[in-house]
Amino acid sequence: MLRVGGVLAAAALVLSACGSDSESSVAADCKPAHDVSTVKEGVLTVGLTNTPPYSFEQDREIAGIDSDILKALAEEECLEIEHAPYTYAAAIPAVNTGRVDVAVGGFYRTEARAKETTLSAPLYVDELTVMSEDGYSTVDDLLGKKIGTVEGYLWVDALKALPGTDLRVYADSGALANDLKAGRLDAALDGYGAATISAKGTDFELAVLEEDDRVPATNEPSQTSMLVHPKDEALAKALDELVGAMREDGRLVKILGEHGLPETAAEVGEARLVS
């Protein structure tokens, strides 16, 4: 469990690291599509997790699938973008206390998160994927092995319960991949998109973990969302409408393709929550 003191310390570091993604990107005659309020007037403040290809920092700006959607939102609502780095554990408190307007990083739509904060409409689907030298693809393959995953994923508790398995939980996908590459893990479990990025330039094999009731997350692809401040109803509505429009006109599929996800990832179906 993350200590409260750790969260507060992380928050202090985050606030000092917050930066602007643009000096003057909003035209003087820009007219917003919606009447939204933000933590800082005229600015969309983003909590950015380091989880490529969903969200990451590149050239001191937000990047990734979720970030590209937010750039479109900022343009539509005449907002500058400022961002700060957050871990998954610190992102929800940051949103709920109003330090940021929105947090991004392929957050799965879980019942627990829905009780804590506002989830955007589903963005895309993601699947639990295994990276390994030996092509592991089943839960049985993982038993007795040293495996790792990223904090905040809905399958963490299920993996902890696997008998004889040594599970290590990491703050982000980069740290997870580094330990796999260093030989400290037999397998790394991540979302499909993140695993694809991590495996580039390596000999690791990727496999979507086969359905198994011991890990319920394998039974249905998870929908992802952004986290929005619970009181920012207008902002949440504007984001949901934009996502719907981007899905209809093909912009969302284009963004997914640019970051290595298949077109089918945009086929989210009806909004749902997983436990």
PLM features per residue range, with description:
Residues 14-17:
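C-terminal motif of bacterial Sec signal peptides marking the signal peptidase cleavage site
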Residues 19, 67-77, 143-146, 153, ...:
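Extended ligand-binding regions for polar small-molecule ligands
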Residues 20-26, 157-171, 175, 206-210, ...:
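Ligand-binding clefts/hinges and TM-proximal coupling segments of bilobed small-molecule sensing domains
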Residues 26-106:
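Extracytoplasmic small-molecule ligand-binding "clamshell" domains
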Residues 45, 49-53, 62-75, 107-108, ...:
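Bilobed "Venus flytrap"/periplasmic-binding protein-like clamshell domains
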Residues 80-142:
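Acidic, polar ligand-binding/catalytic clefts
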Residues 106-115, 186-220:
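A ligand-binding cleft/hinge motif common to bilobed small-molecule-binding domains
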Residues 124-129, 202-240, 263-275:
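Periplasmic-binding protein-like
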